[in-house]
């Protein structure tokens, strides 16, 4: 069995030195725009449509949500999965999400908020860049989450 041991010459880092270490300028993310243009909402760059999400079952639907808003280029399979697994809120309640805009907005706002709170961004402009880029990546299906968020 392998074991790790401390090397005599290895530096010891006090716990105090680790607190807020991420706010050091050289440790910031340094986010640049690649998929977005300043002042333009990534959601406004694509065509949207209202459709129904439906997963059939043997005798009745396993899942159904009518009137959901999705990018026009997303498949019906993506619509069904996202509406069933990723939209938050009880079905037929006012809190129930009904648009990819709501779902991605919720996720992006949460992650960008964590970045702001953790000092990952140099300034608010960088935080807004990060949020816009993540929104564009997700809505254009360049990346997705592995589990419901």
Go through each PLM region and give its residues.
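Extended catalytic cores of very large enzyme megasubunits
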Residues: 1-149
């Amino acid at each position: 069995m392998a074991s790790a041991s401390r090397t005599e010459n290895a530096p010891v880092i006090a716990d105090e030195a680790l607190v807020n270490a991420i706010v050091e300028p050289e440790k910031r993310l340094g986010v640049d725009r690649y998929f977005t243009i300043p002042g333009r909402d990534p959601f406004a760059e694509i065509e949207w449509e209202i459709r129904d999400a439906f997963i059939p079952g043997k005798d009745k639907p396993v899942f159904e949500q009518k009137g959901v808003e999705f990018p026009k280029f997303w498949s019906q399979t993506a619509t069904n999965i996202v509406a069933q697994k990723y939209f938050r809120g009880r079905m037929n309640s006012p809190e129930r999400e009904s648009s990819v805009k709501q779902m991605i907005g919720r996720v992006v706002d949460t992650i960008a908020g964590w970045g702001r709170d953790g000092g990952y961004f140099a300034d608010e402009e960088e935080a807004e860049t990060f949020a816009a880029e993540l929104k564009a990546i997700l809505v254009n299906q360049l990346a997705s989450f592995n589990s419901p968020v």
